[in-house]
C-alpha cells in the first residue's frame, strides 16, 4: 500500500541521512504506515536498529489484548491495521493515558512544542526505550499530531 511505501521512500531516508547511528525507532501503531514503512527501510539498511511500535495500554490489540476506551487519538483503534507487519517490528510498548498526557504537556511547557496526546505517547515510549538502552544510545520518534485538536479535551486542558 501507498502509506508504508511513502514512509519507506521519504521519512526513512530522511532519518537515515540525519542519524548516521541509530539504535531504535519508535512509532505509534495507527495505520501502521509510518512504523512499517520506516521500519522496513531501517531493517534493510541498518538491521541492528530496533523498530518499536506503540499502542495504548487500554487498547493493546496488536499485542493480543482487548480493545478499550482511551484518550489517545490516532492509535489503538481496536483492530490490527492492514498495514501492520510483525516481521518488521522488534517490540511493542504500551503507554498509559496518563503518561501520554504528561509527556505531551511536558513537551509543550518545557520546550514550547504544542503537540498532542499521540505525540506525547510516542515521546513517552521513546523515553522508556532510551532508558532501557542506556546512556549514549540514539532513539528517534516522530510527533504525529499538534495540540490544537485537543483544545476541547478536558483531560488535556486540566493538566
Residues of each region from the PLM?
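Short, well-ordered alpha-helices that flank and scaffold nucleotide-derived cofactor binding pockets
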Residues: 17, 40, 44, 127-131
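Residues that mark the start of a beta-strand
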Residues: 24, 48, 137-138
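Short glycine/serine/threonine-rich phosphate/pyrophosphate-binding segments
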Residues: 28-39, 118-126, 150
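Active-site/ligand-binding loops adjacent to catalytic centers
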Residues: 44-117, 154-159
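Glycine-rich beta-alpha junction loops
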Residues: 1-2, 30-33, 55-60, 66-67, ...
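Active-site/ligand-binding-proximal alpha/beta "capping" segment
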Residues: 1-32, 86, 98-113
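Phosphate-binding loop/pocket of nucleotide- and phosphate-handling active sites
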Residues: 124-159
Amino acid at each position: 500500500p501507498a502509506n508504508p511505501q511513502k514512509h519507506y521512500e521519504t521519512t526513512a531516508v530522511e532519518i537515515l541521512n540525519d542519524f548516521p547511528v541509530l539504535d531504535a525507532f519508535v512509532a505509534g501503531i495507527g495505520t501502521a504506515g509510518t512504523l512499517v514503512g520506516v521500519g522496513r527501510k531501517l531493517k534493510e539498511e541498518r538491521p541492528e536498529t530496533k523498530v518499536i511500535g506503540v499502542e495504548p495500554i487500554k487498547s493493546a490489540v496488536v499485542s493480543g489484548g482487548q480493545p478499550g476506551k482511551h484518550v489517545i487519538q490516532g492509535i489503538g483503534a481496536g483492530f490490527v491495521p492492514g498495514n501492520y507487519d510483525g516481521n518488521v517490528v522488534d517490540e511493542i510498548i504500551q503507554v498509559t493515558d496518563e503518561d501520554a498526557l504528561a509527556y505531551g504537556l511536558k513537551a509543550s511547557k518545557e520546550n514550547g512544542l504544542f503537540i498532542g496526546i499521540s505525540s506525547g505517547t510516542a515521546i513517552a515510549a521513546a523515553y522508556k526505550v532510551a532508558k532501557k538502552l542506556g546512556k549514549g544510545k540514539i532513539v528517534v520518534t516522530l510527533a504525529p499530531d499538534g495540540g490544537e485538536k485537543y483544545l476541547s479535551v478536558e483531560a488535556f486542558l486540566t493538566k
